[in-house]
UniProtKB/Swiss-Prot annotation:
Keywords: Cytoplasm, Dioxygenase, Fatty acid biosynthesis, Fatty acid metabolism, Iron, Lipid biosynthesis, Lipid metabolism, Metal-binding, Oxidoreductase, Oxylipin biosynthesis. The keyword DNA-binding does not apply. Fe cation binds at H527, H532, H718, N722, I865. Pathway: Lipid metabolism; oxylipin biosynthesis. GO terms for cellular component: cytoplasm. Monomer. It comes from Glycine max (Soybean). Gene3D superfamilies: 3.10.450.60, Lipoxygenase-1, Domain 2, Lipoxygenase-1, Domain 3, Lipoxygenase-1, Domain 5, PLAT/LH2 domain. The gene is LOX1.2. GO terms for biological process: fatty acid biosynthetic process; lipid oxidation; oxylipin biosynthetic process. One of its GO terms (molecular function) is oxidoreductase activity, acting on single donors with incorporation of molecular oxygen, incorporation of two atoms of oxygen. Residues 50-175 form the PLAT domain. This is Seed linoleate 9S-lipoxygenase-2. Its cofactor is Fe cation. Residues 178-865 form the Lipoxygenase domain.
């Protein structure tokens, strides 16, 4: 906070004073994806130029160019003008470059600057910056030294600055002090309000690259009706039929055939949401873009030319993707994609082999994935551990509307279940029955899905909790819509576990149909919808209504890093019509529409981990248990580890919030905070705005819960459902994404094939080779961490706030996370906890806070991939 003593003694009486400063910035071409190749050759380039061929590479040239090209003006926090806004100092230009500064990061340049300042100007609290060059730069920080009676004042900027003529208002940055609106120094109030107004924009026109405007729109850019009916997709958001969270507005022109759909193309995101990275290996998001632009067409050409069959003939064929690789015609592929992409795809220069890293799930055992124990374990310790539910009644019932879908109650009978001596009633009473239930999600779509190449079931899986703490699958129900129509209900068959003969193959296939449901639900709902999509409205609302000076802005923004950018790329390349998800996952063109149906039942408050576990019937409240919850599956790695992380986040949020809100009455008058929450609910999640479960944000407790849910969702929940994708799904036999035929019927050639070879029957049923290559290419990228990742408990700048109490609380949070990581490592070494390793011997590390690379561990602050 500013210390504001009397005027006398602040600065030299009656005279000027030079305030020394250091400006740290990064040149555009250091951060530009297309310039990475030049950087690796040592061609740093200058700051003046058009496009990427910038001029000059020496420090002398750089200093000369900057000489009169970047001007700063200090703004007083204590001395207002007649209009009430703080006085503004003279234009001051950057001086010489600092060749050596210990705190500089890679690619950063530091410059001296000296401001003229006197007593009548008071204490600096903000500054203007004007860039007169034709090329933008990334402004990291300004540090003022030896400010009289203040010492050091820091400005953490982290923002792209374009030519000043492109802005309607001069760019402004505030010191790293923290104020709720009512405590803002009077001289800064006008600047604070003006900056928020600039970030909100006027909701008109097409957004340009340099814009910093945050606004809302519906998902009306996933399809392209101009390319034909097959490329049209329903608009998600803005209707009760297809509700959806809002995404960032781009203002692009509508398509010709549908004025309500937006033309696909390069997607605008507010400029500071796309800040760039330092190493080519960090351009993970752009790897996805390359997949869509180059790799997909290349794979399609290979299979169209019949260079390689679209089927695997044995399980070893699948393992060869990771062991020897498969040969592909580089002479064909190189005509479709650039050479650097070819080299990255083939891993080794000159080697015409596509080879994927060995996924963790087969590194110890090649066949343990096939066991019933592993099949069940991955429901509590795999990549989608947040769906399994406690079974409350038997037989399971459906929530589908019987006036539309008829009778959908399960056909599983009690006498069919092997419950280790328990009756169904006894197992229910002792809370030992659980279910993985995808019946209601898939049944409304199965008829449409099965009219395509794909053939699938809506599945229910019943599991029994054994005395040793592991789960045993005891029945799988495979359901289809009735041939006579939906009103006739479901046609179901119940498959029971078997160890020998054709029945064991049928059981293996039944598990595959379940995993196909699970893979699709995971990618579209657990991952995309419940983390990526639901967070974007909060990012938009935060930037529109919480000033950079606001304590909650400082708390939340690290958890938004890169999310709007990766979501925009997903709309371009992953979830778009005929994109990667539609090509490789079962629901195809219905994929994202299915997530809209699930969003109808999304509840913000249920995203809190304790509330989620209780709602799913896998935990009950127990004041005597850790975190006030008793897990009904005691060895539930995701829940056990997640509750530790959740509690640490909540404690940190409570301690931080208490620094700025002493009483509930402090929350209600905070105009920025109230407007932020009102808009996040009413616009960002507008299709659900009338739901009674939204917190009213009238108390400190509500504020803490809201912020904890946002941070949990963006960090730990996303880590839990994302970074295990390749470790578990990189072996397609373990997590197939599609099924192409139903269970063979007796008397058919397919049935005879199933009798003779369980491997061929399995391979002809699940994901094809083409789909496998696409899927593995994507999830390998999605499962990686960038080398400049910022993990939970870390900040990219140690001076993110000047508040020493906040810094101490944050240090405490970081220390707690280190303790938790050590505790979780000990649990993984506990031989009595079978679900932490399982038959595949893959320890549960997805909620270990730190990591890098393709490691199946690490919690980034944000949804950055």
């Amino acid at each position: 906070m500013f210390s504001v003593p009397g005027v006398s003694g602040i600065l030299n009486r009656g005279g000027g004073h030079k305030i020394k400063g250091t400006v740290v910035l990064m040149r555009k071409n250091v951060l530009d994806f297309n310039s990475v190749a030049d950087l690796t050759k040592g061609n740093v380039g200058g700051l003046i130029g058009t496009g990427l061929n910038v001029v000059g590479s020496t420090l002398d040239n750089l200093t000369a160019f900057l000489g009169r090209s970047v001007a700063l003006q200090l703004i007083s926090a204590t001395k207002p003008l007649a209009n009430g806004k703080g006085k503004v100092g003279k234009d001051t230009f950057l001086e010489g470059i600092i060749v050596s500064l210990p705190t500089l990061g890679a690619g950063e340049s530091a410059f001296n600057i000296q401001f003229e300042w006197d007593e009548s100007m008071g204490i600096p609290g903000a500054f203007y910056i004007k860039n007169y060059m034709q090329v933008e730069f990334y402004l990291k920080s300004l540090t003022l030294e030896d400010v009289p009676n203040q010492g050091t004042i820091r400005f953490v900027c982290n923002s792209w600055v374009y030519n000043t003529k492109l802005y309607k208002s001069v760019r402004i940055f505030f010191a790293n002090h923290t104020y709720v609106p009512s405590e803002t120094p009077a001289a800064l109030v006008g600047y604070r309000e003006e900056e928020l107004k600039n970030l909100r924009g006027d909701g008109k026109g097409e957004r340009k690259e340099h814009d910093r405007i945050y606004d809302y729109d519906v998902y009306n850019d996933l399809g392209n009706p101009d390319h034909g009916e097959n490329f049209a997709r329903p608009i998600l958001g803005g209707s009760s039929t297809h509700p959806y969270p809002r995404r960032g507005r781009t203002g692009r022109y509508p398509t010709r055939k549908d004025q309500n759909s937006e033309k696909p193309g390069e997607v605008y995101v507010p400029r500071d949401e796309n800040f760039g990275h330092l190493k080519s290996s960090d351009f993970l998001a752009y790897g996805i873009k390359s997949l869509s632009q180059y790799v997909l067409p290349a794979f399609e050409s290979v299979f169209d030319l019949n260079f390689t069959p679209n089927e695997f003939d044995s399980f070893q064929d699948v393992r060869d993707l990771h062991e020897g690789g498969i040969k592909l015609p580089t002479e064909v592929i190189s005509t479709i994609m650039p050479l650097p992409v070819v080299k990255e795809l083939f891993r080794t220069d000159g080697e015409q082999v596509l080879k994927f890293p060995p996924p963790h799930v087969i590194q110890v055992s090649k066949s343990a994935w096939m066991t019933d124990e592993e099949f069940a374990r991955e429901m509590v310790a795999g990549v989608n551990p947040c769906v399994i539910r406690g079974l409350q009644e038997f037989p399971p019932k459906s929530n589908l509307d019987p006036t539309i879908y008829g009778e959908q109650t399960s056909k599983i009978t009690a006498d069919a279940l092997d419950l280790d001596g328990y009756t169904v009633d006894e197992a229910l009473a002792s809370r030992r029955l659980f279910m993985l239930d995808y019946h209601d999600v898939f049944m409304p779509y199965i008829r449409r899905i099965n009219q395509t190449y794909a053939k699938a079931y809506a599945t229910r899986t019943i599991l029994f909790l054994r005395e040793n703490g592991t789960l045993k699958p005891v029945a799988i129900e495979l359901s289809l819509p009735h041939p006579a129509g939906d009103l006739s209900g479901a046609v179901s068959q119940v498959i029971l576990p078997a160890k020998e003969g054709v029945e064991s193959t049928i059981w293996l296939l039944a598990k595959a149909y379940v995993v196909v449901n699970d893979s699709c639900y995971h990618q579209l709902m657990s991952h995309w919808l419940n983390t990526h999509a639901v967070i974007e409205p909060f990012i938009i609302a935060t930037n529109r209504h919480l000033s950079a000076l606001h304590p909650i802005y400082k708390l939340l923004t690290p958890h938004y890093r890169d999310t709007m950018n990766i979501n925009a790329l997903a709309r371009q390349s992953l979830i778009n019509a005929d994109g990667i998800i539609e090509k490789s996952f079962l629901p195809s063109k219905h994929s994202v529409e299915m997530s809209s149906a699930v969003y109808k039942n999304w509840v913000f408050t249920d995203q809190a981990l304790p509330a989620d576990l209780i709602k799913r019937g896998v935990a009950i409240k127990d004041p005597s248990a850790p975190h006030g919850l008793r897990l009904l599956i005691e060895d539930y790695p995701y829940a056990v580890d997640g509750l530790e992380i959740w509690a640490a986040i909540k404690t940190w949020v409570q301690e931080y919030v208490s620094l700025y809100y002493a009483r509930d009455d402090d929350v209600k008058p905070d105009s920025e905070l109230q407007q932020w929450w009102k808009e996040a609910v009413e616009k960002g999640h507008g299709d659900l705005k009338d739901k009674p479960w939204w917190p009213k944000l009238q108390t400190i407790e509500e504020l803490v819960e809201i912020c904890t849910i946002i941070i949990w969702t963006a960090s730990a929940l996303h880590a839990a459902v994302n970074f295990g994708q390749y470790p578990y799904g990189g072996f397609i036999l373990n997590r197939p994404t599609s099924s192409r035929r139903l269970l063979p019927e007796k008397g058919t050639p397919e049935y005879e094939e199933m009798v003779k070879s369980h491997q061929k029957a399995y391979l002809r049923t699940i994901t094809s080779k083409f789909q496998t290559l696409v899927d593995l290419s994507v999830i390998e990228i999605l499962s990686r961490h960038a080398s400049d990742e910022v993990y939970l408990g870390q900040r990219d700048n140690p001076h993110w706030t000047s508040d020493s109490k906040a810094l101490q609380a944050f240090q405490k949070f970081g220390n707690k996370l280190k303790e938790i990581e050590e505790k979780l490592a000990r649990k993984n070494n506990d031989q009595s906890l079978s679900n932490r390793l399982g038959p595949v011997q893959l320890p549960y590390t997805l909620l270990h806070p730190n990591s890098e690379g393709l490691t199946c561990r690490g919690i980034p602050n944000s949804i950055s991939i």
